Design a protein with these regions (language model features):
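Glycine-rich phosphate-binding active-site loops on the catalytic face of alpha/beta enzymes
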Residues: 95-103, 144-156, 199-219
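Hydrophobic faces of well-ordered beta-strands that scaffold small-molecule active sites
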Residues: 12-18, 40-42, 63, 71-75, ...
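Alpha-helix-loop-beta-strand connector modules within alpha/beta enzyme cores
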Residues: 53-74, 112-123, 161-182, 222-232
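N-terminal amphipathic alpha-helix/helix-capping segment at the start of soluble metabolic enzymes
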Residues: 1-20, 27, 232
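Glycine/Thr-rich beta-alpha phosphate-binding loop at enzyme active sites
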Residues: 39, 46-54, 58, 126, ...
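N-terminal active-site wall of soluble small-molecule enzyme domains
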Residues: 41-112
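Catalytic cores of alpha/beta
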Residues: 28-33, 81-89, 127-139, 188-204
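Conserved, mostly hydrophobic/aromatic
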Residues: 26, 33, 43, 87, ...
């Protein structure tokens, strides 16, 4: 399995959301997408930090043997440091926690990931200032910006999502952190992908866009065709 830092940097990455798969047939879905996905995005939620209850460690452990594609676990929980070890042991290659957890709580989970040789990231809710990522720039490989309300599917992209990506990209440039990847999560559609890429996204989290595709080769060829973003 490859770390996120080893994924290509010259094209848009697809961090495929398994929340949009047929959950009754998760293993076949993983096998079908494995030749194309750069990573699998697994949303894990405790029902408190967000309303949803989502993927749990035993489920991740069960599907881990069926693919070599990296697992990106997006942990939406009030106390991620209490859950991080279970998800890392289950097969997470990259663990993302929220800046809204606070520096102490998020930092503890990030440290657990690094101790196990895994990558770490932070996610930012739509109503949280982008600059909240600043304390974590030396500790993470990935920053995920939510473009919709967290833990909810099927929403339209918030108009400010593009400007937030540009702001994050500029912050990374100002602080010489060009190696940190920016992930756009939420409302990934054919009409939003080009603008998200142009605004600075290194990766997107597609769901129905790929799981409902009748021609995965064409869909992923189109996704990968988007050039390196130029932020203004």
């Amino acid at each position: 399995m490859r770390a996120w830092s080893q994924l290509p940097s010259d094209r848009l990455l697809a961090d495929v959301s398994l929340w949009s798969a047929d959950l009754a047939n998760l293993e076949p879905a993983v096998r079908r997408l494995s030749p194309w996905a750069d990573s699998f995005h697994l949303d894990a939620a405790d029902g408190h930090f967000v309303p949803s209850l989502l993927f749990f460690p035993d489920l991740i452990r069960a599907i881990r043997p069926h693919t070599a594609v990296p697992f990106h676990v997006h942990l939406m929980a009030e106390y991620p440091s209490q859950l991080a070890t279970e998800f890392l042991d289950a097969g997470a290659d990259l663990l993302t926690v929220h800046v809204e957890n606070g520096e102490r709580e998020a930092g503890a989970a990030i440290e657990q990931a690094h101790r196990r040789g895994c990558g770490a990231g932070v996610a930012v809710k739509l109503d949280t200032p982008v600059r909240a990522v600043l304390p974590y720039l030396d500790a993470v490989e990935v920053i995920t910006l939510l473009g919709t309300e967290v833990g909810v599917k099927g929403c339209n992209l918030a108009p400010q999502a593009y400007d937030r990506l540009r702001e994050a990209r500029n912050l990374l440039q100002e602080h010489a952190k060009r190696g940190v990847r920016l992930v756009a999560d939420g409302a990934i559609r054919t009409h939003t992908v080009p603008e998200l890429r142009a605004a600075g996204a290194d990766a997107i989290v597609p769901g129905s866009l790929v799981f409902q595709s009748a021609d995965l080769e064409s869909t992923f060829r189109w996704l990968r065709s988007h050039s390196v973003p130029t932020v203004t």
